[in-house]
Amino acid sequence: MTILFLTMVISYFGCMKAAPMKEASVRGQGSLAYPGVRTHGTLESVSGPKAGSRGLTSLADTFEHVIEELLDEDQKVRPNEENNKDADLYTSRVMLSSQVPLEPPLLFLLEEYKNYLDAANMSMRVRRHSDPARRGELSVCDSISEWVTAADKKTAVDMSGGTVTVLEKVPVSKGQLKQYFYETKCNPMGYTKEGCRGIDKRHWNSQCRTTQSYVRALTMDSKKRIGWRFIRIDTSCVCTLTIKRGR
């Protein structure tokens, strides 16, 4: 599992010339990308100039150490979602890249790796019974996730309720990078398009609906003013219920 994760991380950094987030304290403020950003460094700059000579085991240890530090730091700066109504502003669904990203956002991979570390501390029997596939678990609503560009979105709604134009390219020191958004929405071809899975239709009306959150993107308003604004994008598929009357 560790080797698989490292392969995903290496391919993630290798295939993209993407703008990195700023330090963790800035990420806690919902900042995702800014003008003048730089491209990702190489593995050498992350692990040191002699990392390759120490072999794959040393490289794996280095990545695990860095990832665990990132997860610890992320827990420190993550807002308290119960007390902060703006918690959905903190997202990692925006990427600046010269080509379509081949993997989900890095923080999504970190979350998966965190779950892997938690599972590693379980006994084999506990892991076997905690596997959703073994328990026959299914999602209440079927969803799909994919990277989309500003060319696909064209316009979006900002925090003031106004419609803004999403700019396709962002100027950086060495040229331009495209804005990509990782969107999650209800699957129109899924089995839950007629209602949520597992809901008693005798007593409830159900519907799978796409919900949105705010992310920061480079946009232009109706007065041709260009700037970084929070816009709404599709981020999840949830089940909504209404009770049937007259029963």
UniProtKB/Swiss-Prot annotation:
Keywords: Cleavage on pair of basic residues, Disulfide bond, Glycoprotein, Growth factor, Secreted, Signal. Mature BDNF is produced by proteolytic removal of the propeptide, catalyzed by a FURIN family member. In addition, the precursor form is proteolytically cleaved within the propeptide, but this is not an obligatory intermediate for the production of mature BDNF. Can be converted into mature BDNF by plasmin (PLG). Residues 19-128 form a propeptide. Gene3D superfamilies: Cystine-knot cytokines. Disulfide bonds join 141-208, 186-237, 196-239. GO terms for cellular component: axon; cytoplasm; dendrite; extracellular space; perinuclear region of cytoplasm; synaptic vesicle. One of its GO terms (molecular function) is nerve growth factor receptor binding. Transmembrane segments: none annotated. It comes from the Eukaryota. One of its GO terms (biological process) is negative regulation of neuron apoptotic process. The keyword Heme does not apply. Pfam families: NGF. Glycans are attached at residue 121. Residues 1-18 form the signal peptide. It is found in: Secreted. The record marks 57-58 as: Cleavage. Important signaling molecule that activates signaling cascades downstream of NTRK2. During development, promotes the survival and differentiation of selected neuronal populations of the peripheral and central nervous systems. Participates in axonal growth, pathfinding and in the modulation of dendritic growth and morphology. Major regulator of synaptic transmission and plasticity at adult synapses in many regions of the CNS. Monomers and homodimers. Binds to NTRK2/TRKB. Can form heterodimers with other neurotrophin family members, such as NTF3 and NTF4 (in vitro), but the physiological relevance of this is not clear. BDNF precursor form: interacts with the heterodimer formed by NGFR and SORCS2. Mature BDNF has much lower affinity for the heterodimer formed by NGFR and SORCS2. Belongs to the NGF-beta family. This is Neurotrophic factor BDNF precursor form.
